[in-house]
Amino acid sequence: MDEFDLIHSITPRTIHHSSVDVGIGDDAALYTAKHGVQEIVCVDTMVEDVHFKLHYSSPEDIGYKALAVNISDIAAMGGIPKFYLVSLAVPSKWTESEIKAMYEGMNELAKLYHMDLIGGDTVSTADKLVVTVTVIGEIEKGQACLRSLAKPNDIVFVTGEIGSSAAGLSLLLEETNPQNSSVETDYFIHRHKRPEPRVSVGRLCSIFKRAALNDVSDGLASELNEIAEASCVSIEIVESMLPIHSDLPKLHPNWKEWALFGGEDFELTGTVSNEEWEVLKQECAALHLPITKIGYVREKTKSKVILKTDQTSMILEKKGYNHFK
C-alpha cells in the first residue's frame, strides 16, 4: 500500500462548505469560522475486538459507525456537523481496497449531512485496527443543549427506541438465540451496525430557551445520571413509557437490561420545559421523527435517577458501558 496513493484516492472531489480554505493535501486544514457561532469539537476512537469484530463488521460498517458516533455527539449539543478528520492505525493484513471501503462507509453518512473530510493520518500497526474520528460542528452562540440545563418539572424524553443496539450485538455474538422465528433479527443487527444520529432533533432543541441533551452511547441510565449530576436534580422515569421494539421482549427475558444499560443506541435523551415539550412533540411528528415522553425532572436534591414500575420504585445506578471496568 502506498500512503500517497491512498491520500489521493480518499481526497474529496467536491467541498460542501466554502469556509474550507485548505483541505487534504497540506500539513493541516484551514477553514474560516463564522461570526456568531461556537465551534463544537468531539473525538471518538474505535478499537478492533473492543468496539467491533471483523468477522461480523465489514469495512464499510466500521467506517459508517466510526463517523456516526461522533455526529451523535454533535447532535447532543444541538449542533450542525460540518467537518471530519480520520486517523487510522492499520494492521499490515489490511488491503488498500479495504481501507478505501472504510472511507466509503464514512462518506455514505457524511453526504447525508453535507460534511467535508479535511484531514487525518494513517500509520501501520502490528496489532489491531484502531479508528479515531474527529468531528467539528457549530452551534449558534449560547444555544448549546448542555447537560447542566435540566430543571424541576421538566419533561424527560428519548428519541427512537432503546435496547435495540444491545440486542443486535447479542445476536452478532451469538449470545441470544431467538426461539420465535417471527423476530426481525436483521433489524436489531442493523441498529447496532448502522446507528442513525438524531441531528434534526438536536437542532429542534437548540431553538428553545433551554434544553438539556445527552446521546445514548453508554446506556439510558448512565446518560440520565449524567444529566441529573450536571443539573443537580433527580430524574424519574416510568418503565411502561420506555419506547422499545415490539420484538425486544421476545429475544431475551432480561430485555430491560438492554433497554436501560445496553447503550450504543445513539438516540438522544434529555429534558425540556412542559411548554416546549408540546412544541417539540409536534415538530417531531411533522418531520416523522420518533420521540417519547418517559418521565419528569423532580426536585433539586441529591442527584439520582428513579425507575417507577407498577408497584415499586428503584434507583438506577450509573452503569452501562465503561472502558475501564
Swiss-Prot record:
Mg(2+) 4 binds at residues 27, 73. Mg(2+) 3 binds at residues 27, 73, 215. It is an enzyme of class 2 (transferase). InterPro entries: PurM-like_C_dom (IPR010918), PurM-like_C_sf (IPR036676), PurM-like_N (IPR016188), PurM-like_N_sf (IPR036921), ThiL-like (IPR006283). Mg(2+) 1 binds at residues 44, 121. It catalyses: thiamine phosphate + ATP = thiamine diphosphate + ADP. Belongs to the thiamine-monophosphate kinase family. This is Thiamine-monophosphate kinase.
